[in-house]
Swiss-Prot record:
Protein name: Ethanolamine ammonia-lyase large subunit
Function (record text): Catalyzes the deamination of various vicinal amino-alcohols to oxo compounds. Allows this organism to utilize ethanolamine as the sole source of nitrogen and carbon in the presence of external vitamin B12. It is spontaneously inactivated by its substrate and reactivated by EutA.
Binding site for substrate: R160, L161, Q162, N193, E287, D362
Required cofactor names: adenosylcob(III)alamin
Pathway: Amine and polyamine degradation; ethanolamine degradation
Major enzyme class: lyase
Organism this protein belongs to: Escherichia coli (strain K12)
Family recorded in the similarity comment: Belongs to the EutB family.
Binding site for adenosylcob(III)alamin: P194, Q246, S295, M401
Subcellular location: Bacterial microcompartment
Keyword list, A-Z: Bacterial microcompartment, Cobalamin, Cobalt, Lyase
Induction: When grown in ethanolamine and adenosylcobalamin (AdoCbl) (at protein level). Note this experiment was done in strain JM109, which expresses the eut operon.
GO MF annotations in UniProt: cobalamin binding; ethanolamine ammonia-lyase activity
Top-rank taxon, per record: Bacteria
Gene: eutB
Length: 453
């Protein structure tokens, strides 16, 4: 394994695979904060060159956190299909990138090849891709999952309806649900981030969500994004269960900082299969985001792109209905400006799809970042072009509870009509029955929540 290269007469020597992975990243403030970023553009190019010549086996055999030290590493490594891996283990990362981007490589080819990839290998491919590569490659890798709606079908574009309220006021939540539905939003999930994380409050909010779903016979699923154990307890006590949610991290230490163990995720999957009101096989929902491991002091000297890829390796094990990166939510300490946020969003979507998960993105930023609403619109259009499964939707994109800026209900409508995309088929049929959509286009009734009253 070669760890050095010569560039413009200068020799660049790297100590190990972890350092090569980190320094091959595009510039981002989180890697600088962690002390792992390349010192110059020249060193970054040198690291990319070294990384491109490494083999799949080189990367697999050198995980950024040792197998014996970390349950996430063990899960990722143990899930590898050895037959698929043996076919590609001697490929260089450059050859793997070319394979993913090749027009001769089919969806089925990638579906088999991805079974032989560890998360570090997935991250390595992303690091030597341009933004256009990330878009083009992801578009070639659709991932379709089924709950009560079917998400990820090529030609469709879904959205989470996110009716958050600063007091968990159920009238406010219901009003936002009606407005979102009137724009054709909600086919991914109707999901509330609660202020208060307890069984009673969670049950009350779930009852509100399913009160609307049941009244209008809406083919979708609800979720309250409390801690996974709170959701499990509420569902066991009789609350209506849709998707079961949890934020995840790419290391065992990071999971512990979130109060999560793999056994909890195992239990969530079992409870969902037993109790939840889901027609399909997929009942879990995960959120991630670059920088989460570093913010928890749980990155072990690894860069944030690689740690994010490990989130997807963990998620893949549980076959979730949806996963999304909350890409700019963590703030400028980790992704400083719109350029870094856009790059991260494209990387995350590409890595999620190459990992084989139903990947969406919360196109967002915090109010102290060097970004504005144009960032969200730029990123959502780029991601929709890349085949992203879903984005978020809330009134005017302003989340007054979480205090950040995301995409609005009308943004989903704009993307669908701009790029000739449709909601999930089950949800579109319901929209047509309500007079909100006809022939894939919103009608004059759209955007008027009073049609539900």
């Amino acid at each position: 394994m070669k760890l050095k290269t010569t560039l413009f007469g200068n020799v660049y020597q790297f100590k190990d695979v972890k350092e090569v992975l980190a320094k091959a990243n595009e510039l981002r403030s989180g890697d600088v904060l962690a002390g792992v970023a390349a010192a110059s553009s020249q060193e970054r190019v040198a690291a990319k060159q070294v990384l491109s010549e490494m083999t799949v086996a080189d990367i697999r055999n050198n995980p950024v956190i040792a197998y014996e030290d970390d349950c996430v590493t063990r899960l990722i490594q143990d899930d590898v299909n050895e037959t698929a891996y043996n076919q590609i283990k001697n490929w260089s990362i450059s050859e793997l990138r070319e394979y993913v981007l090749s027009d001769e490589t089919s969806v089925d080819d990638i579906a088999f090849t991805r079974k032989g990839l560890t998360s570090e290998v997935v991250a390595a491919v992303a690091k030597i891709c341009s933004n256009a590569d990330l878009i083009y490659g992801a578009k070639k890798m659709p991932v379709i999952k089924k709950a009560n709606t079917t998400i990820g079908i090529p030609g469709t574009f879904s959205a989470r309806l996110q009716p958050n309220d600063t007091r968990d006021d159920v009238q406010s939540i219901a009003a936002q649900i009606y407005e979102g539905l009137s724009f054709g939003v909600g086919d991914a999930v109707i999901g509330v981030n609660p202020v208060t994380d307890d069984v009673e409050n969670l049950s009350r909010v779930l009852d509100t969500i399913y009160g609307v779903i049941d009244k209008f016979n809406i083919p979708t699923q609800g979720c309250v994004l409390a801690h996974v154990t709170t959701q499990i307890e509420a569902i066991r006590r009789g609350a209506p269960g849709g998707l079961i949610f949890q934020s995840i991290c790419g290391s065992e230490k990071g999971l512990k900082e979130f109060g999560v163990e793999l056994a909890m995720l195992d239990e969530a999957r079992a409870v969902g299969a037993e109790f939840n009101r889901i027609a399909g096989e997929n009942c879990l929902y995960f959120e991630t985001g670059q920088g989460s491991a570093l913010s928890a002091g749980a990155n072990f000297g690894a860069d944030q792109v690689t740690m994010e890829a490990r989130n997807y390796g963990l998620a893949r094990h549980y076959d979730p209905f949806i996963v999304n990166t909350v890409v700019g939510f963590i703030g400028p300490e980790y992704l400083y400006n719109d350029r870094q946020i856009i790059r991260a969003g494209l990387e995350d979507h590409f890595m999620g799809k190459l990992s084989g998960i139903s990947m969406g993105c919360d196109c967002c930023y915090t109010n102290h970042a060097d970004a504005d609403q144009n960032l969200n619109e730029n990123l959502m259009i780029l991601l929709a072009t890349a085949g992203c499964n879903y984005i978020m939707g809330m009134p005017l994109g302003d989340d007054i509870m979480l205090n950040y800026q995301t995409t609005a209900f009308h943004d989903t409508a704009t993307v669908r009509q701009l790029l000739n995309l449709r909601p999930s088929p089950e949800f579109e049929r319901w929209l047509e029955s309500m007079g909100i959509m006809a022939n894939g286009r919103l009608t004059k009734r759209a955007g008027d929540p009073s049609l539900f009253f």
